[in-house]
UniProtKB/Swiss-Prot annotation:
BP term (GO), one: DNA-templated transcription
GO molecular function, one term: DNA binding
Subunit and interaction comment: In plastids the minimal PEP RNA polymerase catalytic core is composed of four subunits: alpha, beta, beta', and beta''. When a (nuclear-encoded) sigma factor is associated with the core the holoenzyme is formed, which can initiate transcription.
Reactions mediated catalytically: RNA(n) + a ribonucleoside 5'-triphosphate = RNA(n+1) + diphosphate
Gene3D superfamilies tied to this protein: 2.40.50.100, 2.40.50.150, 3.90.1100.10, DNA-directed RNA polymerase, beta subunit, external 1 domain, DNA-directed RNA polymerase, subunit 2, domain 6, RNA polymerase alpha subunit dimerisation domain, RNA polymerase Rpb2, domain 2
Protein's name in the database: DNA-directed RNA polymerase subunit beta
Length: 1070
C-alpha cells in the first residue's frame, strides 16, 4: 500500500486483475450479447420456428476440481444451458425445453484456463483502433499528399485521397480509385444531399463533369460504376440483386463496419452526433471526412499520430472469447437449420433437444485454446513468469502486425506509453517492441484504451484526488514526473519540476502542474520493478534482466534477497504459489501433503502441491511453514511454494562475489565459482521430466503393455512390474525400459520357421509376430521415478488411445556450462569450479563464492550491480534486509551512494572489521590469493549480490553425434539435438583445416565420412576392425546435388574423375 500524507491511499492492483476483469466481462456482457444475436430459425416452408430464450441461460458448476482436471488431462469447464422453444405456426403450439449448448472453459484463480490438462493463457492484443486517421506523405515529386484512412472494426481500410486539383478520390483497391461522389451516390445519397452536407460545395462542384453527372444520375448507375472499378470488370455490367450482395459482402462488410468503438472515434474526430448504435459507415461520415481532408490540404487541423495509444485499442480476453462464442453460435445456427430441414423432409417431429448439439461450441473453444496464436501454454518456470505471462501485450496475431513487416516507429517507445506500457520490458530478437508488458498500475478502460492513475493537484487544498486517465485525456494536462516527497522538503511554489505535456518533456514551475504520478514504479512492468537501483542501469541491460528473471530456476533451498524493491511479496502472493489461509483457525496437524485446519468447529484439509511438473520441467512443490497448535489468521501464509520464502519471491541466492580477473577464467563474461556451491547444494535444483507412450489398435490387432519383451536383456527390464510399467521409486538410467510394449505385425514369408510354414500350408493359420516398441529412457534422462499415470479417455475406441505417462525427477547441481545471472543484465557461463582453498579469500579468511569479470561493468553501464553488491555485504553483516524504491536521487543528489557507504561504515563499525569500509577506496577491499596466500595488487570490490541460476543448463544443451539419421534429399546429417543430428564440420572448421594444410583429413571429413553413401558404411566397418579407409572412385552426394541444381537452371556440368592408378579420365554421369 502506498501512502501520501496529503491524500488518499493508493494500493497496487492485483497483478492478475487484467485477466480476471476480461473473463468476468465476457461472462457478464459478452455471453448475453452473442446469445441475443442468435436469430429465429424457420424452415423453408415457414411452418416451424426455433428460438432461444436468453434470459434463462445458466452455467453449471464444474463437475471436477482444477487439480483433477490437470491430473486426468481434462478441460476445466462449465456446461451452458439455455431454454429453447419450437413453435408450430399452423397450430400455434410451442414446445419449450432446456438444452445443453456446450462447455465453456473457465478461468481459475491464477487467471489461466485448463484445457486437456494443460494450463493455457490468453494474451491481450494491441490493434489499430477503428476510426479515421489523417496523414501526409511525400510523393515522388516531393509534394505532400494528404490522405484519410478509415479503418473498420474488421481491420479493412478505405483510403480517401485529395489530388493537386482538390479532387477527392476513394481508393477501392491497390490500383483502382473512384470519385467520392460516386461512392456517396452508391451508398444512397443524391447530389443535392451531398452538396447540402458539405462545408465546401464549390470544391465538389468544380470537379463535377458531365461524365460524372451521368455516373451519379441514379443510385443504380453509381453502384454499377463502383462495381466496375472495384472488380475491374470490362464491358457493361447489368444491375442485379446478386451484384449488390457481392459488393456488400466483399467491400462494405469488410471496410465499412465500424463497431461501437469506431463509431465513437468517428464522432469525436469529425464532430458528428450520430447515435452510438449506428455502427455502419454512413454517407454523412464520408462527406464529413472529405470536408476535413480538404481542411488538411489547406493547413487546418492537426494530423494524426498512428502510434499514439489513443489511436490503439486493446483486444482483451473478453473480446477474444466473445468472438469465438459468436462464431460457435453461427455454426450452431447452420446445424439447427440443416436439422430442421432434414426433419421436415423425412416427416419427423423435431424437439429443441434433438435440434441442438454441443459439438460446435465445444470444438470451437478447443480449437481456439489449442491453435490461436494469442492462446499460449502458460510459462511456469517460476512464480514471476506466471504473473508476467498474463500481463503481456502483443501487436502480433490475427488482424495485427508481423515481425517481418513492422517498422521501427511502431516498435519504438512513444510518450503516450508512460504509465501504461513498460518502456523497458519487451522481447529480444525479431519481436522487439512488438510484445510489451503492462505497467503495474495500468488497466483496460471501457472503450478498450489503456488507463493510468494520477493524483490531481488542487491549488488551495493539500488533498490530492486519484483519477484514471485515458491516453487521449492526459495530453491536456501538465503531468509532473517526479514524486511529491522531494517537494515536501522545501517550499513547493518555488520549485521547478520535470513534467510531460503534449508528448513533450518540459521543466515547469510547481504551480503550473495539474497532475502528478502516484508512485515511482508506475511506469514499469513487474519484471523491471524487481530490479533494485534500476535508475543506475542502461535500459538495454534492464531489459535483459527483466527477461532473465523469468528464466530463473526454483532452487531446492530458496533464499530471500537482501536488497529488494518491496514488490517481491505481492508478486509471490498473486502468483498463487504459496498456500494462504482462507479463514482463521487453529492448526490441528501438518503433513508433507496437507495441512488440517480447524475453524468454526469444522476441520478443513488444505492439500499441498507435491512435486508437480511445470511445462518447463521445473519442480513445483509446497512446504508447510506453520506448526501444529498454532493459531492463524485469514490471509496468513500456510506453506511456501517453489521460489518463495515467507511469502516473498526468492529466485536466487545471496553469494559472496569478487569483481576481479582470475587467470583468464572469467574472460568474456565467464564466471569462476567455488566448489562450496556444489557440495552444499547452494544452487541445486530439481527438474521433473515427462515421458509418455500411447497404445493403439492397429490393423493387425491391439498393442500390448507387457513385461515379457523378447530379444531384450533382463538388465533393461529390471524396473518393470508385472504389468510392464516401471515401478515407483526406481532409479533409471539411459536406455532402460520405462514401459514395455509389443506391436503386432505380419512377418515376411522368408522369416517363418519350418513348423510355422507347415501350419500355414495345412491349417491356413496366420502366424503373427510382434515388434518391440517400448518406451526407453533417452540420453540425459537418468533419475528417480516419482509418478506413473495411466490415462484412458472416455469411449475406449481406437480414436481414444490409452496414454501412459512416466515422471522422472532429476537432481541437478550447478556445473561447468550452466548459465547464471544477476538482476542487472550481468549474465555469464560457469567456466571452472575451483576448490574452496584456491579461491580468493577476504581478510577475515572467508573464501569468495564467485568471481566476476570487472570489465563487464563499465562498457555495459549497469552500475546498479555494484550498489547492490556492496549493500548486500553490509546487510549480511548487519543482518538486515533492504527494500529500496527506484529513483531515490529525487530526495537528494548521490542518494544511492550515500546510503550504501553509510551502511558499509555502520557494518564496519559494528563488526569491528575496518576492511569492510576503507575511506581510501570505499566499497573495495584487499583480498588474498588462495593458492599463494599473498595479497592481490589492487583492491577489489566484494559484496553479496543476488545471483540466479537460469533454465539454460548444460545438461539440456550438450550433444554429440557419432552416427545418426541423414536427410533423404541431400544425404547430409540432420540438424538439432532432438533429431540426434549435428553437422560435424562447418564452414569455419573447413577454413581452420585448410589453414593447417591437412588435405587428406579434410577430404575424409567432407566426403567419405559425410555424404558418400557407400563409403561411409565402409568407413564405419574399417574403423571397427582396423585397416586403411577405402577411397571411392565416384563423386559424393553433395557434388551430385550441385550438378542437379545447376541442371534445373539449364546449366549442364560435365565432370570427370581421374583414376589414381593409371591416370585415365573416366566420364561418369551424375
Amino acid at each position: 500500500m502506498l501512502g501520501d500524507e496529503n491524500g488518499e491511499m493508493s494500493t497496487i492492483p492485483g497483478l492478475n486483475q487484467i485477466q480476471f476483469e476480461g473473463f468476468c466481462g465476457f461472462m457478464d456482457r459478452g455471453l448475453t450479447e452473442e446469445l441475443y444475436k442468435f436469430p429465429k430459425i424457420e424452415d423453408t416452408e415457414q411452418e416451424i420456428e426455433f428460438q432461444l430464450f436468453v434470459e434463462t441461460y445458466q452455467l453449471v458448476e464444474p463437475l471436477i476440481k482444477e487439480r483433477d482436471a490437470v491430473y486426468e488431462s481434462l478441460t476445466y469447464s462449465s456446461e451452458l444451458y439455455v431454454s429453447a422453444g419450437l413453435i408450430w405456426k399452423t397450430s400455434k403450439d410451442m414446445q419449450e425445453q432446456t438444452i445443453f449448448i456446450g462447455n465453456i472453459p473457465l478461468m481459475n484463480s491464477l487467471g489461466t484456463s485448463i484445457v486437456n490438462g494443460i494450463y493455457r493463457i490468453v494474451i491481450n492484443q494491441i490493434l489499430q483502433s477503428p476510426g479515421i486517421y489523417y496523414r501526409s506523405e511525400l510523393d515522388h515529386n516531393g509534394i505532400s499528399v494528404y490522405t484519410g484512412t478509415i479503418i473498420s472494426d474488421w481491420g479493412g481500410r478505405l483510403e480517401l485521397e485529395i489530388d493537386r486539383k482538390a479532387r477527392i478520390w476513394a481508393r477501392v483497391s491497390r490500383k483502382q480509385k473512384i470519385s467520392i461522389l460516386v461512392l456517396s451516390s452508391a451508398m444512397g445519397s443524391n447530389l443535392r444531399e451531398i452538396l447540402e452536407n458539405v462545408c465546401y460545395p464549390e470544391i465538389f462542384l468544380s470537379f463535377l463533369t458531365d461524365k460524372e453527372k451521368k455516373k451519379i444520375g441514379s443510385k443504380e448507375n453509381a453502384i454499377l460504376e463502383f462495381y466496375q472499378q472495384f472488380s475491374c470488370v470490362g464491358g457493361d455490367p447489368v444491375f442485379s440483386e446478386s451484384l449488390c450482395k457481392e459488393l456488400q459482402k466483399k467491400f462494405f462488410q469488410q471496410r465499412c463496419e465500424l463497431g461501437r468503438i469506431g463509431r465513437r472515434n468517428m464522432n469525436q474526430r469529425l464532430n458528428l452526433n450520430i447515435p452510438q448504435n449506428n455502427t455502419f459507415l454512413l454517407p454523412r461520415d464520408i462527406l464529413a471526412a472529405a470536408d476535413r481532408l480538404i481542411g488538411m490540404k489547406f493547413g487546418m487541423g492537426p494530423l494524426d499520430d498512428m502510434n499514439h495509444l489513443k489511436n490503439k485499442r486493446i483486444r482483451s480476453v473478453a473480446d477474444l472469447l466473445q468472438d469465438q462464442f459468436g462464431l460457435a453460435l453461427v455454426r450452431l445456427e447452420n446445424v439447427v437449420r440443416g436439422t430442421i430441414c432434414g426433419a421436415i423432409r423425412h416427416k419427423l417431429i423435431p424437439t429443441p433437444q434433438n435440434l441442438v448439439t454441443s459439438t460446435p461450441l465445444t470444438t470451437t473453444y478447443e480449437s481456439f485454446f489449442g491453435l490461436h496464436p494469442l492462446s499460449q501454454v502458460l510459462d511456469r518456470t517460476n512464480p514471476l513468469t506466471q504473473i508476467v505471462h498474463g500481463r503481456k501485450l502483443s501487436y502480433l496475431g490475427p488482424g495485427g502486425l508481423t515481425g517481418r513487416t513492422a517498422n521501427f516507429r511502431i516498435r519504438d517507445i512513444h510518450p503516450s506509453h508512460y504509465g501504461r506500457i513498460c518502456p523497458i520490458d519487451t522481447s529480444e530478437g525479431i519481436n522487439v517492441g512488438l510484445i510489451g508488458s503492462l505497467a503495474i498500475h495500468a488497466r483496460i478502460g471501457h472503450w478498450g484504451s489503456l488507463e493510468s492513475p494520477f493524483y490531481k493537484i488542487f491549488e488551495r487544498s493539500k488533498k490530492a484526488q486519484m483519477l484514471y486517465l485515458s491516453p487521449s485525456r492526459d495530453e491536456y494536462y501538465m503531468v509532473a514526473a517526479g514524486n511529491s516527497l522531494a517537494l515536501n522538503q522545501g517550499i513547493q511554489e518555488e520549485q521547478v519540476v520535470p513534467a510531460r505535456y503534449r508528448q513533450e518533456f518540459l521543466t515547469i514551475a510547481w504551480e503550473q502542474v495539474h497532475l502528478r504520478s502516484i508512485f515511482p514504479f508506475q511506469y514499469f512492468s513487474i519484471g523491471a520493478s524487481l530490479i533494485p537501483f534500476i535508475e543506475h542501469n542502461d535500459a538495454n541491460r534492464a531489459l535483459m534482466s527483466s527477461n532473465m528473471q523469468r528464466q530463473a530456476v526454483p532452487l531446492s533451498r530458496s533464499e530471500k534477497c537482501i536488497v529488494g524493491t518491496g514488490l517481491e511479496r505481492q508478486v509471490a502472493l498473486d502468483s498463487g504459489v504459496p498456500a494462504i489461509a482462507d479463514h482463521e483457525g487453529k492448526i490441528i496437524s501438518t503433513d508433507t501433503d496437507k495441512i488440517i485446519l480447524s475453524g468454526n468447529g469444522d476441520a478443513l484439509g488444505i492439500p499441498l502441491v507435491m512435486y508437480q511438473r511445470s511445462n518447463k520441467n521445473t519442480c513445483m512443490h509446497q512446504t508447510a511453514r506453520v506448526r501444529r497448535g498454532k493459531c492463524i489468521k485469514k490471509g496468513q501464509i500456510l506453506a511456501d511454494g517453489a521460489a518463495t520464502v515467507g511469502g516473498e519471491l526468492a529466485l536466487g541466492k545471496n553469494v559472496l562475489v569478487a569483481y576481479m580477473p582470475w587467470e583468464g577464467y572469467n574472460f568474456e563474461d565467464a564466471v569462476l565459482i567455488s566448489e562450496r556451491l556444489v557440495y552444499e547444494d547452494i544452487y541445486t535444483s530439481f527438474h521433473i521430466r515427462k515421458y509418455e507412450i500411447q497404445t493403439h489398435v492397429t490393423s493387425q490387432g491391439p498393442e500390448r503393455i507387457t513385461n515379457e519383451i523378447p530379444h531384450l536383456e533382463a538388465h533393461l527390464l529390471r524396473n518393470l512390474d508385472k504389468n510392464g510399467i516401471v515401478m515407483l521409486g526406481s532409479w533409471v538410467e539411459t536406455g532402460d525400459i520405462l514401459v514395455g510394449k509389443l506391436t503386432p505385425q505380419v512377418a515376411k514369408e522368408s522369416s517363418y520357421a519350418p513348423e510355422d510354414r507347415l501350419l500355414r500350408a495345412i491349417l491356413g493359420i496366420q502366424v503373427s509376430t510382434s515388434k518391440e516398441t517400448c518406451l526407453k529412457l533417452p540420453i540425459g534422462g537418468r533419475g528417480r521415478v516419482i509418478d506413473v499415470r495411466w490415462v484412458q479417455k472416455k469411449g475406449g475406441s481406437s480414436y481414444n488411445p490409452e496414454t501412459i505417462r512416466v515422471y522422472i525427477s532429476q537432481k541437478r547441481e550447478i556445473k561447468v556450462g550452466d548459465k547464471v545471472a544477476g538482476r542487472h543484465g550481468n549474465k555469464g557461463i560457469i567456466s571452472k569450479i575451483l576448490p574452496r582453498q584456491d579461491m580468493p579469500y577476504l581478510q577475515d579468511g572467508r573464501p569468495v563464492d564467485m568471481v566476476f569479470n570487472p570489465l563487464g561493468v563499465p562498457s555495459r553501464m549497469n552500475v546498479g550491480q555494484l550498489f547492490e553488491c556492496s549493500l548486500g555485504l553490509a546487510g549480511s553483516l548487519l543482518d538486515r534486509h533492504y527494500r529500496i524504491a527506484p529513483f531515490d536521487e529525487r530526495y537528494e543528489q548521490e542518494a544511492s551512494r550515500k546510503l550504501v557507504f553509510s551502511e558499509l561504515y555502520q557494518a564496519s563499525k559494528q563488526t569491528a572489521n575496518p576492511w569492510v569500509f576503507e575511506p581510501e577506496y570505499p566499497g573495495k577491499s584487499r583480498i588474498f590469493d588462495g593458492r599463494t596466500g599473498g595479497p592481490f595488487e589492487q583492491p577489489v570490490i566484494i559484496g553479496k549480490p543476488y545471483i540466479l541460476k537460469l533454465i539454460h543448463q548444460v545438461d539440456d544443451k550438450i550433444h554429440g553425434r557419432s552416427s545418426g539419421h541423414y536427410a533423404l534429399v541431400t544425404q547430409q546429417p540432420l540438424r538439432g539435438r532432438s533429431k540426434q543430428g549435428g553437422q560435424r564440420v562447418g564452414e569455419m572448421e573447413v577454413w581452420a583445416l585448410e589453414g593447417f594444410g591437412v588435405a587428406h583429413i579434410l577430404q575424409e571429413m567432407l566426403t567419405y565420412k559425410s555424404d558418400h553413401i557407400r563409403a561411409r558404411q565402409e568407413v564405419l566397418g574399417t574403423t571397427i576392425i582396423g585397416g586403411t579407409i577405402p577411397k571411392p572412385e565416384d563423386a559424393p552426394e553433395s557434388f551430385r546435388l550441385l550438378v542437379r541444381e545447376l541442371r534445373s537452371l539449364a546449366l549442364e556440368l560435365n565432370h570427370f574423375l581421374v583414376s589414381e592408378k593409371n591416370f585415365q579420365i573416366n566420364r561418369k554421369e551424375a
